[in-house]
Amino acid sequence: MALWGGRFTQAADQRFKQFNDSLRFDYRLAEQDIVGSVAWSKALVTVGVLTADEQRQLEEALNVLLEEVRANPQQILQSDAEDIHSWVEGKLIDKVGQLGKKLHTGRSRNDQVATDLKLWCKETVMELLTANRQLQSALVETAQANQDAVMPGYTHLQRAQPVTFAHWCLAYVEMLARDESRLQDTLKRLDVSPLGCGALAGTAYEIDREQLAGWLGFTSATRNSLDSVSDRDHVLELLSDAAIGMVHLSRFAEDLIFFNSGEAGFVELSDRVTSGSSLMPQKKNPDALELIRGKCGRVQGALTGMMMTLKGLPLAYNKDMQEDKEGLFDALDIWLDCLHMAALVLDGIQVKRPRCQDAAQQGYANATELADYLVAKGVPFREAHHIVGEAVVEAIRQGKPLEALPLADLQKFSRVIGDDVYPILSLQSCLDKRAAKGGVSPQQVAQAIDDAKVRLAL
């Protein structure tokens, strides 16, 4: 059933209908469309369009339809309706007859779809927040279990300074906490209702839009009808949140892919999140992580595509805006799936402590400690930096770590170096000295874990 047609003398070409119709994807807004219609029916009573008995009949029929949709949402796709609004109205008319045709009084699909999408976005944000916090919790638990797992920290993918696996986990907790904050901020701007703005100029009926917004769970109604029906900032904002969040998950995946590789060997992934090769029987591939990394690109593309769609649109509504949903649905589905999958990867991961520690002792990751030692002896840092660089060259020439160089060799580069240098060069000393807030010292890591547990109510 089309919601228009009186103006036209010819039927739409079937090819245009297939091109124009959106039911194949906006069917996902069915529940929100029904909920919005119930609220609108109540508003129509307040302005005398519906009697209380008529509204009751409509609400009862809509609630029955809501249960039918929840039981089998795929039934919607069997229809040739243009969009979800047409489908809901058609089903309502099937149930209550001519009365169903009164429901759309004073309402446009422009404010209707804007309301539906905002309601869907609000619900989806809550799902994303839950999944985000579940992953943060998994990272904190993994950190707590691996506070003593010393491993190399990297810059430029070169061993730089020793850290712990716990400290690495907590770095991603921080990223996810920022993602959580962005979603919460987005939710605040989502929480205004456009229903009652009509096609673009507002409704001709004196409906209390603030009351209507409250019935739908919004904190307030929007202030300008032109903006309200054409606003898709929330779509851009959620896509941006997703793009940033997926960058974080992609980096998480890349790190673990490397840590799991034969070249690093710091962790072993569970069989539950890996797959094999059809040819090479020895392979155990990190497919879950590679797919997280790969799916990141689709989400970035959705954001870019939506920005390009909106950038040249005049006020108010244009059919271009129908393109807001597929990319948004796909991007947020991906983000949600990847949050769940990342948590599953952590469930069963094994950290290979001996291999991690062995790698941390290689690559001259304690060179900065020697420079700090020299500074403590009164050597200016820039000079100390140069001295240590020369010492590292000598250690490389001898094929030894810095702490294995004889004192006589170290003193060739600076006479201030004494026997007290060797304890300073130990891995434990490297960690212990990073005791400022946010550092890798055991005390700071333990405190960060405790703080995260309080914030996450673990």
From Swiss-Prot:
Localisation per UniProt entry: Cytoplasm
**EC category:** lyase
What GO CC annotations are associated with the protein? cytosol
Q: What SUPFAM superfamilies does the annotation carry? A: L-aspartase-like
Question: Which Pfam family, giving just one, matches this sequence?
Answer: Lyase_1
Query: Which catalytic reaction applies to this protein?
Result: 2-(N(omega)-L-arginino)succinate = fumarate + L-arginine
**GO molecular-function annotation terms?**
argininosuccinate lyase activity
Instruction: List the keywords (alphabetical).
Output: Amino-acid biosynthesis, Arginine biosynthesis, Cytoplasm, Lyase
Return the PROSITE patterns for the record: FUMARATE_LYASES
EC number(s) recorded for this UniProt protein: 4.3.2.1
Alphabetical list of InterPro entries matching this protein: Arg_succ_lyase_C, Argininosuccinate_lyase, Fumarase/histidase_N, Fumarate_lyase_CS, Fumarate_lyase_fam, Fumarate_lyase_N, L-Aspartase-like
UniProt key word Lyase: yes
Q: Major place of localization?
A: cytoplasm
Q: In which pathway does it act?
A: Amino-acid biosynthesis; L-arginine biosynthesis; L-arginine from L-ornithine and carbamoyl phosphate: step 3/3
Q: What GO biological process, any one, is recorded here?
A: L-arginine biosynthetic process
Family listed: Belongs to the lyase 1 family. Argininosuccinate lyase subfamily.
Per its record, how is this protein called by name? Argininosuccinate lyase
Q: What is the lineage of its organism?
A: Bacteria, Pseudomonadati, Pseudomonadota, Gammaproteobacteria, Enterobacterales
